[in-house]
Amino acid sequence: MKRFEDRISIHAPASRVFGYVSDFTRHGEWAGNGLEVTRSGAGPVAAGMTFSTTAKQFGTQREQSTIAELTPDTTFAWDSTGALGRVHHWFALSGEGDSTTLSKGAETVDPTFLAKITSWKLSKDIPNGIHRDLANIKAHLEGPAA
């Protein structure tokens, strides 16, 4: 299926941006649809760690997410498995001083029948969601409470 990606410039160092987006339990602060995240295990966050997520979109959506890549200040990626199949998500960061370019992307790599028959809708919803998420992250990191 298609690969979607967008980027935004944030006035914050890469280490701060990375710390925020790589904290999976805080994704509900910027993601839409009432996302709730529960960590499945203990110990330091690392590739292979799993999380359970619940969101409200067309009913309750439950997914299992596994961290696929964690490279400090550079990349945070995870795979989510749920009603749409397996979707690979990522953040890529490029920082220079107090400014960071943050990219966010998603690609359905193992779609279910549901994902295939709704691909026309997903091809609109996913890019809109990525754009909204990036704007919310920027607002949080640059806002007065930052």
Where are these regions (language model features)?
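Short alpha-helical
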Residues: 25, 46, 109
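Well-ordered beta-strand positions in beta-sheet-rich domains
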Residues: 5-7, 62-64, 88-90
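Hydrophobic ligand-binding cavity/cleft-lining segments
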Residues: 1-42, 146
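Beta-strand/loop substructures that line and gate deep hydrophobic ligand-binding cavities in soluble
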Residues: 79-132, 137-139
